[in-house]
Structures are given as C-alpha cells and as structure tokens.
C-alpha cells in the first residue's frame, strides 16, 4: 500500500504554499485534488499554483481536461491512482493537495459501484432543470429518496441529476452509499487539514477574490463567453458566472466581487463541515510551519 500525504482544508487556507514547501523538504511531488484546477484555461479563477510553484515542484492533474468536459470523482480517482503510482515508483513522496471532498473520499476510500450513465436521460433532466429550475429536480429527488436529497444542495445540478439517474434504474442512491460506507482504506494516507480562524480565512478569501478580478479573471471569463456563447457549461467554477456577467454588462464589478466573496466563504464552510465528518483527519492550526510539519511526517 503506497504511502501518501494529503494536505486538505478550506479554500484560501494556504494548502498550495504548504504543499510546495513540504514537497521540497520531503522529496515529494504534488497531485492536485481540486475539482476545478483540472480544467485548462481556468487558471486565475481557480487559484492554480503559480508558474514559480509549478517550476519548484512537479505537479500532476492540473490542466488535464477542457472546460465543459465531464470530470467526476471516479475518473479523478483513476487519474490520481496512476499519478501516485508514477511518483512512488520513482522513490518520491506523493502529496495530494486540494479541498474537493468527493475527490478525496473517492481516492482514499473508493467509489460507489453505481449503475452506468444514461446520456439521453441526463440530457432530458438537464433540459428540465433549465426550464423548471434546479430546485424542482431536487424536490423530485426528495420524493423518491429523502435521505439522498438531504445530502445534496438544491442547486447542485450534477449530483441531483446523477441521483435521479440512479433512482431511475430502480435503486435508491442512499442505499448504495450506505452499503459502501467508505470503509476501505486504499492508501496508507496521513491527512492533514488546515484550520485557520474564521475571521482570518474570510479576510484571505476576500483579498484573493479581489486579486482574481484585478489579475485576469475577467479575461478568462471573456474567453469562455466567446467560446461557448449562450451554451456555457452547466457547472463553472465559483466566480466565472459573475465575471461573465461583468464582461457582458449585466453586472457591476463591485457587485460581482461581493457575490463571489460570499460564494467562496460559503464554499469554505462546506469544505470544513465535510472534513469534520471524515475519519483520521489531523487538524493543523496556524502558523503552518513547514519545517515542523516535515519533521512530524518523517517521524510518523
């Protein structure tokens, strides 16, 4: 079983910088576990590692898919497995860095064996969501499987559609998850989660979002709008819909910045809640001392 170090935590908590620092000290390479950083061309709005960080330490699973291309936890886990095996085979330490809970869970504990995808049904459900609204599909799921609906936010179209797709095959999604229970340990993983105080995290989030809008997010949004027109991908990373609204003249810049700051703060809260439910998490309070953490990792 391959040894693995995982650096998790809420957005803007400093995962990337710490992962790079630890990789340099421990002879590691970084495997991305951020569901939005896999997409090419979405760099500023997803806070990808800088060119300097990527030059300092090898990174894997960045820019492996096109915007709008399907990427789910199962595909991510398969790609990550291959990257981790490659890093370990060269005598390096794989360091998984990211805050996407579904991806981390799939990698560490496996994925649920669910019925295959039905492209026609998915297209029909997505059309209904566009016509009736996502909450209408969520309500339909709640009628079929209240437990599954309770675990999915009413605006999370990707997960709602997948749950309805499973239910259409005669299986309750909640029963599938209950049977799996994510008990399997696929790696000898040490999971460190960064735990900054809420006030300082919110300040970092607000500053980062302002920097995104000043540092190229609008240009990325303009390129997306030119590429896709009115047929934008249904699940863009946080901030791109608002930035596209700005470049189209539908939203004032200050209001767009405010909305994205709020969205990132809410996302950070969900990430923390997710990690609190996971087993084996070591919470790390600031300051995040890379030398101290490297010694702790080396000493087991």
From Swiss-Prot:
Read off the InterPro entries from this record.
Dimethylallyltransferase (IPR039657), IPT (IPR018022), P-loop_NTPase (IPR027417)
Q: Which reaction does it catalyse?
A: adenosine(37) in tRNA + dimethylallyl diphosphate = N(6)-dimethylallyladenosine(37) in tRNA + diphosphate
Where along the chain is substrate bound? Answer: 11-16
Highest taxon, organism lineage: Bacteria
Its GO biological process annotations read: tRNA modification
Q: Where is this site: Interaction with substrate tRNA?
A: 100, 122
| A Pfam entry, by short name | IPPT
Question: Keywords in UniProt for this one?
Answer: ATP-binding, Magnesium, Nucleotide-binding, Transferase, tRNA processing
**Residues given in the record as ATP binding sites:** 9-16
Q: Where is this region: Interaction with substrate tRNA?
A: 34-37
Q: Which cofactor does it need?
A: Mg(2+)
Task: Please list the GO terms describing molecular function.
Answer: ATP binding; tRNA dimethylallyltransferase activity
What family name appears in the similarity comment? Answer: Belongs to the IPP transferase family.
Q: State what protein this is by name.
A: tRNA dimethylallyltransferase
């Amino acid at each position: 079983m391959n040894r693995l170090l995982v650096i998790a935590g809420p957005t803007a908590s400093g995962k990337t910088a710490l992962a790079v620092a630890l990789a340099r000290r421990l002879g590691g390479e970084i495997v991305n576990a951020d569901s939005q950083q896999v997409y090419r061309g979405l760099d500023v709005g997803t806070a990808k590692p800088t060119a300097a960080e990527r030059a300092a330490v090898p990174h894997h699973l960045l820019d492996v898919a096109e915007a709008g291309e399907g990427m789910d936890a199962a595909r991510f886990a398969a790609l990550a497995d291959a990257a981790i095996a490659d890093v370990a085979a060269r005598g390096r330490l794989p360091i998984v860095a990211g805050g996407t809970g579904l991806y981390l869970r799939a990698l560490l504990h496996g994925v649920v064996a669910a019925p295959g995808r039905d492209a026609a049904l998915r297209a029909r459900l997505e059309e209904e969501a566009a016509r009736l609204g996502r909450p209408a599909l969520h309500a339909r799921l709640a009628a079929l499987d209240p437990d599954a609906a309770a675990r999915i936010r009413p605006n999370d179209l990707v997960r709602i559609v997948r749950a309805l797709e499973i239910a259409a095959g005669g299986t309750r999604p909640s029963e599938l998850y209950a049977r799996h229970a994510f008990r399997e340990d696929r790696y000898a993983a040490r999971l460190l989660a960064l735990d900054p105080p809420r006030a300082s995290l919110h300040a970092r989030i607000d500053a980062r979002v302002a920097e995104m809008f000043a540092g190229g997010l609008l240009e990325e949004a303009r390129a997306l709008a030119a590429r896709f027109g009115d047929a934008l991908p249904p699940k863009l990373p946080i901030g791109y819909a608002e930035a596209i609204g700005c470049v189209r003249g539908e939203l004032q810049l200050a209001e767009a910045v405010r909305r994205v700051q709020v969205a990132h703060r809410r996302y950070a809260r969900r990430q923390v809640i997710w990690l609190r439910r996971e087993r084996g998490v070591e919470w790390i309070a600031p300051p995040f001392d890379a030398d101290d953490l490297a010694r702790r990792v080396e000493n087991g």
